[in-house]
Amino acid sequence: MIKDYFKIDKNPKKGLLPLEWAMLGYMAITVITMLFAFTKVVNPESMLWGRLRILVITLALWGVYRMIPCRITKMVRIMAQIALLAWWYPDTYEINRMFPNLDHIFAGWEQDLFGCQPALLFAKAMPWAVVSELMSMGYFMYYPMIAAVVLYYFFCRYYEAERASFVLLASFFLYYLIYIYVPVVGPTFYFDAVGVQDIAKGIFPALGDYFNTHTNCLPTPGYTDGIFYQLVEDAKEAGERPTAAFPSSHVGVSTICMLLAWHSRNRKLLFTMLPFYTFLCMATVYIQAHYLIDAIAGWISAVVFYFLLMAASKNMRCK
């Protein structure tokens, strides 16, 4: 019943939610990293102020929940932390830009494993408008898939809503930690910096701190007049940075979404998401956002993160 979501909880949770603690843990680790390398951080003041604002938002929403302890105010707390990922993602670039780029290593591994650069060849092999739009559609559906899983658990499986949200958010922060300390930018940035012709010849130079001052990338391959193509381009212009390539969190988190859908035993949810998930995974290489090894690492890491976090949260239940 809808009214249940506005009913005052008789035994409200007094402290922070586990996903809020996960955020604070990530915040603490990044602040410590910044302090150790403070002289190299480009925008330390804005980064610290941003963290302070997030802390204030978190505590303010906790205060609202304490005043009006119901399911809706708890959902607002959860959705706020998920929405704030849009701030945390580009923030990874502000930290990892201090470290030497590692794309030459990963592009070399890609060449050794597959004898080519799949990110260069995939779109060329399938340049058709229909394929391009399906790929862009899948890539665009990343955040809607996350929202669908969170909202499904909240409205249809409430007793595990807090757990599912924790697994998703903690997974994001684990990926973000990897991105900070393993600075890989992906084909669209690295190939643009080196030159596609040299990449095709198997030339993968080390670029050091090049991406500390350069953020140019290749134009996305595909059908440029497509609706979903334009939506993906708009998203790139709004928040894309030379960061977060290995492992692919698009593949990883969407895989965790699929595992949570499987855990819910709702076949309709699982099979509705399946085609979007399939195209999303393919799109990561098609649009040159990731190397193929990034996608493979995304699948492997997703399974590891999912089962570790599900085990850690097995006693997490909402009443």
Please report, for each region that a protein language model flagged, where it lies by residue.
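N-terminal transmembrane-helix/juxtamembrane module of multi-pass inner/ER membrane proteins
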Residues: 1-54, 72-146
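Aromatic-anchored segments of alpha-helical transmembrane domains
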Residues: 27-36, 84-91, 172-180, 277-286
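Structural signal for the C-terminal ends of transmembrane alpha-helices
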Residues: 61-71, 151-159, 261-265, 307-313
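Interfacial segments of alpha-helical transmembrane regions
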Residues: 75-80, 147-183, 188-202
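Membrane-interface loop-to-helix entry segments
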Residues: 131-145, 241-262, 292, 296
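Membrane-interfacial alpha-helical segments at the cytosolic side of multi-pass membrane proteins
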Residues: 148-153, 251-270, 300-309
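Membrane-interfacial catalytic/cofactor-binding modules of polytopic membrane enzymes
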Residues: 181-263
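Interfacial helix-loop-helix junctions of multi-pass membrane proteins
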Residues: 186-189, 245, 279-305
